[in-house]
């Protein structure tokens, strides 16, 4: 992939996610909410203008919210996080809510571009998962999602209301690579697979994975791969450059279709992958699996942040509360992500919930390559949550990391 294509890869991913999301959302619309439906009254004079990735900014979801909330208008723009962050820092007033990712919150909090949302204003908040309210002793609080989203330790106001999260890993071809070989981040850099591995073009992803691998190989000892210091960034950059020059990578991928095609063809047999991409390869009738890396998963969460000065704050709160109910939670779950609320259990078909969340066998007709008796790769949500290496976070040495990433791209 050329540098120009790397800079523009997000567009193709958005196109895919828009189409995939529309299908999933379509299945969700019309699901009864029962006691979980809860909105502020008197929204008829409000509108909801949102911006974010197409993972969450989906037309069918917005239309369903409009119908159920009574807001007079909704609009959504799909764009990548850096672009929106630049717009916000420049002072745009075009949006009411940014559907952002936890790791980017520090930049907009420090510049007063977002305002917190009170949990007391959301009737569905009571069923949020412990992941977002209780710190895991495995990491410092600030290095996990619970330390990113709250205004303070009273946990009464949120900088970001979580709506989607997942644990990312390695996608591989089990007919060409054994499960044992693929069960480590070092596999992406193993000479045995020279010319047949793929590396994501997002620098925060690539550097974290390189650090995970180097830790496993005894080349580094970085306790928090999501926030390496300058010296560790320098070593990881040297490692990445040497692998690139040796021809280790079949592709520096960012385009969803490219990833799927390369894995399906066997030109690339290992890659750091999005789980929906692995499903897309399986849907073509090819063997493809999401690995359980011994070093652990990369964890992340997307959610709603209210933009400071919005004239539609009540609509933002209602939209955030809506995300903690049935239809949107079902839509993202059937794409292969997780909903942060336990409300999903009563809203989703019980057999589908059992497959996506509880590690139970698939029941019913084949769907996107998932056949009767298949299990979700990695097992249940509980099992996967216990195997997280680190949560994505904003690195202290972000500028230095980006400088070294540019050197890698130019090598």
Each language-model region and where it sits:
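N-terminal secretory signal peptides
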Residues: 1-15, 25
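Conserved C-terminal helix/tail region of periplasmic/extracytoplasmic solute-binding proteins
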Residues: 5-7, 372-411
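Early extracytoplasmic/lumenal segment of secretory-pathway proteins
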Residues: 41-111
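Extracytoplasmic ligand-binding site segments that recognize negatively charged/polar headgroups
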Residues: 82, 109-258
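Alpha-to-beta junction loops
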Residues: 90-99, 113-114, 193-195, 265-270
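Extracytoplasmic/periplasmic substrate-binding proteins
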Residues: 248-309, 346-353
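Mature extracytoplasmic/periplasmic domains
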Residues: 302, 306-381
């Amino acid at each position: 992939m050329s540098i120009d294509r790397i800079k523009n890869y997000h567009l193709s991913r958005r196109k895919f996610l828009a189409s995939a999301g529309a299908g999933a959302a379509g299945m969700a619309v019309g699901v009864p909410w029962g006691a979980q439906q809860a909105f502020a009254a008197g929204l008829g004079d409000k509108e909801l203008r949102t911006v974010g990735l197409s993972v969450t900014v989906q037309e069918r979801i917005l239309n369903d919210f409009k119908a159920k909330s009574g807001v007079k208008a909704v609009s959504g723009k799909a764009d990548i996080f850096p672009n929106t962050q630049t717009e916000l820092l420049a002072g745009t007033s075009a949006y009411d809510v940014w559907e952002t990712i936890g790791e980017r919150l520090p930049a907009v909090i420090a510049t007063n571009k977002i305002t917190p949302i009170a949990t007391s204003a959301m009737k569905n908040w009571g069923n949020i998962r412990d992941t977002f309210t209780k710190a895991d002793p495995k990491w410092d609080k600030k290095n996990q999602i619970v330390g990113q989203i709250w205004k303070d330790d009273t946990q009464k106001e949120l900088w970001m209301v979580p709506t989607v999260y997942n644990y990312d890993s390695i996608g591989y071809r089990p007919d060409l690579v054994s499960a044992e070989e693929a069960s480590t981040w070092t596999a992406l850099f193993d000479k045995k697979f020279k010319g047949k591995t793929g590396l994501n073009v997002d620098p925060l992803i690539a550097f974290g994975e390189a650090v995970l691998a180097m830790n496993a190989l005894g080349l580094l000892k970085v306790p928090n791969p999501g926030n390496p210091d300058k010296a560790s960034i320098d070593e990881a950059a040297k490692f990445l450059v040497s692998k690139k020059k040796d021809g280790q990578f079949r592709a520096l991928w960012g385009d969803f279709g490219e990833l799927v095609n390369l894995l399906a063809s066997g030109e690339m047999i290992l890659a750091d992958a999005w789980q929906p991409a692995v499903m897309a390869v399986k849907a073509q009738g090819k063997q493809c699996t999401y690995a359980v890396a011994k070093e652990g998963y990369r964890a992340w969460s997307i959610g709603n942040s209210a933009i400071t000065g919005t004239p539609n704050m009540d609509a933002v709160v209602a939209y955030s509360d809506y995300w903690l109910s049935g239809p949107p939670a079902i839509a993202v779950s059937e794409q292969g992500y997780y909903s942060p609320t336990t409300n999903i259990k009563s809203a989703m078909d019980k057999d589908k919930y059992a497959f996506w969340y509880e590690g139970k066998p698939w029941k019913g007709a084949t769907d996107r390559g998932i056949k009767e008796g298949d299990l979700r790769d990695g097992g249940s949500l509980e099992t996967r949550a216990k195997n997280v290496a680190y949560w994505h976070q904003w690195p202290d040495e972000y500028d230095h990391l980006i400088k070294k990433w540019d050197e890698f791209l130019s090598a």
